Curated annotation (Swiss-Prot):
Residues 65-183 form the MTTase N-terminal domain. It is found in: Cytoplasm. The gene is miaB. Binds 2 [4Fe-4S] clusters. One cluster is coordinated with 3 cysteines and an exchangeable S-adenosyl-L-methionine. Belongs to the methylthiotransferase family. MiaB subfamily. [4Fe-4S] cluster 2 binds at residues 220, 224, 227. Its EC number is 2.8.4.3. Residues 439-502 form the TRAM domain. Monomer. Its cofactor is [4Fe-4S] cluster. Keywords: 4Fe-4S, Cytoplasm, Iron, Iron-sulfur, Metal-binding, S-adenosyl-L-methionine, Transferase, tRNA processing. This is tRNA-2-methylthio-N(6)-dimethylallyladenosine synthase.
Amino acid sequence: MNEEQRKASGQVSSSDKKSEKDYSQYFEAVYIPPSLKDAKKRGKEEVEYNQFQIDERFQGLGNGRKFYIRTYGCQMNEHDTEVMAGIFMALGYEPTNSTEDANVILLNTCAIRENAENKVFGELGHLKALKREKPDLILGVCGCMSQEESVVNRILKKHPFVDLIFGTHNIHRLPELLSECYLSKEMVIEVWSKEGDVIENLPRARQGKIKGWVNIMYGCDKFCTYCIVPYTRGKERSRRPDEIIQEVRRLAAEGYKEITLLGQNVNAYGKDFEDMEYGLGHLMDELRKIDIPRIRFTTSHPRDFDDHLIEVLAKGGNLLDHIHLPVQSGSSSVLKLMARKYDRERYLDLVRKIKEAMPNASLTTDIIVGFPNETDEQFEETLSLYREVEFDAAYTFIYSPREGTPAAKMQDNVPMHVKKERLQRLNALVNEISAKKMKEYEGQTVEVLVEGESKNNPEILAGYTSKSKLVNFKAPKEAIGNIVKVKITQAKTWSLDGEMVGEAIEVN
């Protein structure tokens, strides 16, 4: 609950005791949920840029305490987890890999599909017993699910043992929220329907020293009819270029070999700047001059992928020619229902431009099958587009209605057995083309950024090529964190086996 909601209710104080009798009804009276309707009405209010700092009141709040964060969903959630972990550690908390040892447990959630939400509710069920054993444990739910009013109300009614709920726009207020949890016997809820400002100088506990996430913008204004993200992540807000460039320079100085620029729609970067014309192409053109071997970005929206960005990417160097370009459907009619704001031909024209500028570019995509009203003929159009483009890989999904989105009001009239059959056919095509493209690597020598031991065999090292191909090979452990040359000896559908050739590559 934020301060406005608290003042409006006039019913909550830190000294109140938790009511076991009618707890959920009590909170229904004072809790104002995030509003999807209001999200769609948002205007173009000026975004404020603020610097994060921890109030001296909260210094040492975590001394002698441990935290555990379980992350669901996309790279943005992984990035947010790094930020929250950084805040925890700045407060004096220590990380732990065990829920049993934790004094604070956060579930950083994903709302993109119903299956992701079910996993979180299942985990809450498992943690109920632990909370009963450790009543002083703080159990929190954050991330995109927290921005959905139906989810918050479900937690209030069915999981009243949860201590803390907060959304995606107020991660920077974690110190205040934790302090309130310790002082109050009530569930602490702070979910802002309105997107927050851009907060700089946030601490981060990055996972490893090889690859790093760099957020360049927040939110999405596209409002595709099936997607909950514009509601859970808010309007598009870009970080200032100088802040991003400084962060990338710091990572380069710390020895990172690869960075990925993050945003719900990175191609819209800079469109909200009123004082200058500056887009993703301009940013990439500056970042390519920084001494870091590899720079990627995700996720792209075809609608905003402009010619200037293609021109800059074609300069190569540390700008990788692996582009994730979600198409969602090969049918113009379905794309119109999805409100993607491009049709089949416009997408194919964009692909042609990319391949003309970067003949060796690797393209991957996202595809949804079984969207409302999708016919057999329209699904065949998706298959034909996939064959024409020959994507290196695809993330494929059965359509999942999300409450509050326009598509959820459409009649979900494609039977589940048809959806599953279409997904099976699509995946067969995806596997076929992937195997064909991977086969072309046999006998080639590729550069691999070594990330660590293989998950299946500690004697084998694993890493990725510039085109995101997984490579497994034998090499000394000293190769971890370096870019090495590997000759490919065997291609599989989704990975490559090889032999290390020579020493690690020096990157100047």
